[in-house]
Amino acid sequence: MKAALIAQQFAVAGRLVTADTTGQGNVNDTFLVIFRTTFSEERFILQRINKRVFPKPEYVMENMRVVTEHVHRRLEEEAHLSDRIWQLPRIIPAKDGRDYVVDGDGEYWRAISLIASAHSYEKVQSLEHAHEAGFVLGQFQRLIS
């Protein structure tokens, strides 16, 4: 499987256990990847970035790095102001140090940390759910400013 070969090009310790299709994404092809060592297991998300939607995938990854690093700094500065735990995906670098891998077909792939407790919804589940989504979106907008 191509995803398994690509997954092994990222800087992750251990041996590849699986790289299985996951999610119902409309844009990128997404895989849940598991690597295992004798003492630990690392799960992450591998995505083939859709070049029809994102014609410059390298810019997408540069923007993702800049934004996540900025937001992480802001969260560290403001840690004393919140009782919430905020998690952002972490970019897992390729073995060559880049934020992505380009395969033999010119397709771009990225690896990002898995936020195990995260869920994706097709529609709002309740008024409380909508309120929480709005709160989090507002906080994210504030943090990137």
Q: Where would I find each of the regions flagged by the language model?
A:
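Conserved ATP-binding subdomain of kinase catalytic cores across diverse folds
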Residues: 18-145
